[in-house]
């Protein structure tokens, strides 16, 4: 018996679960091993950035500003990919986003801790591309790297 797939595979609960786990692991990795910076939780980075601005800790300001900027650039890159490849026949634009994300995250694994700034920027860039590319589950709004909105939406449904 064959199963019929309805809608986009990218909107399935399975993909949403995998991406959510991935997003959580990326945040845990950058926070625990790359200088206490959040890859996904940009609100946390904004709070820490503001605290370090007040304390005039300029090195830490850069540490928290870099992922914010990279996140914004990652959203823009995902949109550029969507616009350019949305009608492509051989590969879906979201597959291209995932391929870039995988390559970036693989490369980060080889970066030494002396360049955590670059590593965090790359992870935040990849996270932003994921957030921008995978925005729905079965037609409902979804953020694959943030839990609070998903928990609220899930309880509401």
What are these regions (language model features)?
Residues 1-12:
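Short, Lys/Arg-rich, polar N-terminal cytosolic tail immediately upstream
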Residues 15-23, 66, 70-74, 78, ...:
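Alpha-helical transmembrane segments in multi-pass membrane proteins
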Residues 20-38:
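Alpha-helical transmembrane segments of multi-pass membrane proteins
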Residues 44-50, 123-157:
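Substrate-agnostic recognition of the 12-TM MFS/MFS-like secondary transporter fold
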Residues 51-68:
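Interfacial helix-start motif at the membrane-water boundary
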Residues 75-90:
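Helix-to-loop junctions at the C-terminal end of transmembrane segments
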Residues 90-99, 120-122, 143-147:
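Cytoplasmic-side transmembrane-helix entry/capping segments in multi-pass membrane proteins
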Residues 99-116:
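C-terminal ends and interior cores of transmembrane alpha-helices
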